[in-house]
Amino acid sequence: MSTNKKINLTEFLNQQYLCECLTVREIETLLEFTDEVTFAKGEIIADVGEVGEALYFVVSGEAALVHPEEGGGSLELAHANEGEMLGSMSFFDREPRSIRIVAVKANTKLLRLRRIMYQRLRIEHPFIAVNLLEDAIVSLDRLFRRVTQDVATYSKYLYGGKR
């Protein structure tokens, strides 16, 4: 990774919830454990049935969490924007993915933290790893709240007000 790119990523991460308790040096350390990957619009980042072997952080662009439907269509469940984490459920519980993660915009850039690097990070830099876990919890909480609100809205639409 070039020096300019590393500086830009450090500045970007320094503004994100994930790194709000980390020093610049700790952010630079985190970057040493990740690699940057780029996806084209519509490209699959992670697919249904795979066990998550990496965590992803959206640097630029956007990704969608979609559930493939029979017959080729798909139901979009949520979006992940800059600064958000992707792939934490399957990564931590090691169960096959139940949704597909797809790049929504061209040149969607993600930081990828592979499992083997996370295991090293956890041992060598536990404070950074704890911050990742907290961010995963917050990300899942946000997703759960969004989905819950959507279900409530659809339920009200389908069944009307109070029964």
Regions found by a protein language model. Give the residues of each.
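Cytosolic regulatory regions built on CNB/CRP/Popeye-like sensor folds
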Residues: 1-163
